[in-house]
Structures are given as structure tokens and as C-alpha cells.
Amino acid sequence: MNEEVREIYLSLWALCKDVERPLRHRYRSLRDTFERVARERMQNVALQATDLAARINYLGNQYSLSREQMNALHTFRLTSNDVMNRRKEAVAKEFHRDVRSVAEAYSVILATPIPKELDGILPKKQWKSSMKREKTALLRRIRVCFDYADDEFLYVHPVDEVSEECWKVRYNQLGVNDEFTEGVPDFWRHAQLNLLDVKLNEDGTYTPSFIVLEPDYLIDISSLAECYRDYGSHPANYLMSRLVPIDNARPLLLGNIANLFLDEWIYAKEEEPDYVACMQKAFKQYPIELAVCEELHDAEKEKAFFADCQKHFEHIRQTVTETFGASGYNLDKSDAVLEPSYICEALGIQGRLDYMQRDMSSFIEMKSGKADEYAIKGKIEPKENNRVQMLLYMAVLEYSMGVDRRKQHPYLLYTRYPLLYPARASWAQVTPIIAIRNRIVANEYGTQMHNHPSYTAQLLAQINPVTLNEKKLQGKFWEQFLAPSITSFQKQLNALDGLEKTYLYILYNFITKELYTSKSGDVESENKTGASTLWLSTLDEKREAGEILYDMRIIDNQASLPNTCGKQKISHNPTLIFCETTPSDVWFFK
């Protein structure tokens, strides 16, 4: 027995003997040790299994653990989850059972029998699991680990309970979840799936309405909505948006300034905001953007831009002061939240709204650009990508905040007209949107897993007019206005020589891998990393790592004081002063 293995087994023996130490802390140490051993055995594996359930399944397959041994490890995982999240009190009998389960797994993974000293103080093998949840006919959400698929079923392992055999999940069900069928061949073994609105069938199979691939990898709502173009909604549109620079910064700059105007009108008290003062704030907030915007270097275009700014300022004033209180809207700016951010692990998306009532009954997404002026003659309609964005915000409130979608009132504010448009679209459209999200995530995973120029070359080759023109458009509009931007990308890519292309693909792979690990975490990292730790790490883990401020109390708020007193400007630093209510000596700021 080498020294490393000896120390691993010795740590188990010490945990059993250290009776003075609280069981909850010993559970944490047991879990940390097991996760470290699992990570070390996966260091040279391309699979980014950052979730412990997926790691256990991978190790079970790699080292031929029996189903009983794997179920015992899952029982340990679930019990430690409950203990570390304070959902239950730790029990000594269960702790020693779980130490036995981990030791038995080590004996196979480390190819070294359990030392007699440790074996003698552990209970006998007990493979029977008690970690089964009560099943109901309709389940809101189930997290599972994908194994394989055939033409009718996905075969998966549940993450939140122990199962003796794979669950069978029906897919390709017409009108229910058939939109996800195209993406199933891209699923990989041990991938995490969220099954939403799941029906338990009489034959013991499951039929979900949504199948969400790798939900810990959050896709930005606005980026996902931008996949919906006039010519189609292919996932390669996501790649093109990432790679093609913005030709004209004017619309983006105007949108940012319009958002500033909305802030001013929402927070205004008796005295109305002044346009000139607001523009001065805009110049302070966006000095570089205004200085480098090419259109503003032309005197006529500069004049038109600031005329547009004043028009949007007036339209926002009209909307906030008049339309908000009109019959049918009942929007109250005094009880609103500006730019609330949301994370929706259920659907694997994230986003930020422009305006929301505090009770989440109504929300507004503001657009400074054009609506669809041509779909219906003489009528202004929201663009498809804007409708998609609103549907996704509704879905976030439904699945993350528990707000019934039928009680939500979403509005699109087109400040160009102005038009405050009730933007309720068909809920059935959410399914194909999430299916596109899955295909985007599969592309991202494939890029970082293969990490090879040839794979990336094939992926980026999808950015061509034939592939992206899913609606088979023809005629002047397609040929002169839509196709050229797609063709231009391919021309620039093809103009590179072999070395330049290889450099581009390698750089793209590197950035994609860094982005993937920054979101989902890195299997090779000693600690939990990535944005997903927000919901995957327990409070104890965050606290011990010094990565959370909690139980804080504001004792002085200087953040929102006005900059003026009458016409006189007042200089002050916007500050917030907090006081700890729970003393701690550990803080860690990355």
C-alpha cells in the first residue's frame, strides 16, 4: 500500500474515531475527501462532470463498480446533501454506513483492500437504500444523469434519489416534447438533464414537457432570443453573433441612453427630470462610446442622433406619466424594481429585465429600435426575437419564482413610437426555444471536449446562407439585405491561410473552454468553481471558503442621495456601510 492510499484510508479511520467533532463537520470532511479522490481519477478525462452525481456514475462505469456499490455512494451523496444543507440532523449510524460505502468504493478505485483496522470499526455491508422519494403522478422538476437513448426512451439515473435500475423517459412525443428529438443524438453519457413538468405513466415510464441539457450552463436570454432571425432560428446564429463584430454602435448607444432616461423618470419625485441634465449624465456614463461612435463624427448624423435622444426622452416621459396609470395597465413606478437579474437553473438560462413590479405581476422590456412594421399592413407588431425574449422571462418567473404565467402581464416598450405592447405569446413556443438552447450547449460542450481545430472548423462551417436560411427565403430582401452579412463572414474566414485558420480555431477553443468552466465549473479544480456554485454549494461551503457575505445590516446609506440641492451641485461619494450580525474572521475576495 503506497503512502497516498494509506493516508486516504487513515482519514476515514480518523473520521470514525473523532467523536468529539460534530457529525455535520465530519460529513463535510468525508465528502471533501471523496470528491478530491474522484477529481484525481478524472484529471485526464475530457468529460466536464462537475456534479458529484455524474462523477459517481462515471467512476462506476470506469472502475466497474457494482450497482449496489454505486447506489450506496449515491445514498451517501444524498444524505450528505441533506446534512450540509441543514435539511436533516446527522445520525451516527448513517455516518458510519456512509464511511463503509466510501471505503468499499476506494477498495475498487484504488485497487487496495480496506485495512483491517478500518474494516473492524465499520458496520457490515448494507446495500439496501432508504433514499427513495415518494412519487406523484405529476412532478414539477427532476434532475437526472443521462446514460443512453434508443428511438423511444432516454435511459437515465435520478440525481435526487437512489434507483436500482435506469429510469425510462419517453421523448419524441408529438405535441408534448417532440421538439427535443433533433438534439438527443448530441447528448453525451453522464450529461445532466432537467426534466420539467413530468408525467409519471402507468407503466412506470416518465414523460416530461421539457428536457433541458446541462442546466448548470446558463445561456443569456437576449443572446438566445437573437437566434431568431428573419430567415430562421438555427443554433449557428448564436455562433455568428459571437464572432461578427457590431458594424454600427449607434443603436446600442441609443438603447443605453434610453435606459438611463427610464431610470430618471422612474425615480423622479415631484420635480421632473431635465433632458439636458440627463444627457450630461449620459456623457459622463458613456464618454468613450460617444467619442468613438463613427456616425457621430458626421455633423448631420450627430444632429439626428441627439434629436432621436430627445424624442425617446419625451416618449419615455409620456409612457411613465400617462400610460402607466391608464386603464388596463395599472403600473406603479413607486413599487417597481429596475434591472432585476434572474438565474433560472431549471431551464438553464439567465437574464435581466428593464422594469418589474415588486410583486412580479407585471414587467417591461424596453426596445429603442424598430418593431415589425411590415408583417401586418398599417399595424406595428413586436419582432419575433422580442416575443421570444418575453416568453423566456415569463418562463423564468414561472420556474424560478413560482409566478403562474397566466397571472403575469408582460409588456414590450418600443420607445421609438411610443408603444407599450402587451407581449403575451403562445406558451407552446417555449419548447422549441429551449430545444435550440440545448443544441447551443451541445456545441459548446463539444468544442471544449474535442478541443481540436478540425471539430471547430466543421462547427463554424455551419455559418453559411444555405444552412441558416431555414425559411428558404428568396428575392430582393434576402439577397440584398440578409444574406450578405452571412456571406461576408464566410469570405473573411476563407481568406485566411492555413496557419491563420488554425490559430483562430485554437483561440476559439481556448475561449470556449474557459467560458464553459467559468459557468459550470472545472472538474480539475480542487474547490468548487464556476457560476453554478451559487446553487450547487451549500451555505457552509460558501462560508468556510469565505465566498459569501450574509446576515448583513445596512447602517448608513449614501448611495442614492441627490447630486443637487436646488440648482447647486453637491459632491459626495455614493457609499453603503454594512454591519455584521454574525462575526466572522474569514473573507475571500477574488
Where are these regions (language model features)?
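Charged, glycine-rich intrinsically disordered N-terminal tails and low-complexity linkers that flank
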Residues: 133, 142-145, 164, 168-294
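A non-catalytic, helix-rich entry segment at domain boundaries
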Residues: 261-338, 513-515
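Short amphipathic alpha-helical face segments that pack within enzyme cores
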Residues: 28-32, 253, 257, 388-396
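Accessory interdomain/linker segments of ATP-dependent helicases and helicase-like nucleic-acid enzymes
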Residues: 113-162, 458-589
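Structural motif
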Residues: 17-28, 226, 244-255, 380-385
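Mg2+/Mn2+-dependent nuclease catalytic core
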Residues: 158-188, 333-439
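Amphipathic alpha-helical interface elements
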Residues: 1-122
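Pre-ATPase regulatory/linker segments immediately N-terminal to the P-loop/RecA-like helicase/translocase core
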Residues: 234-237, 413, 418-419, 427-431, ...
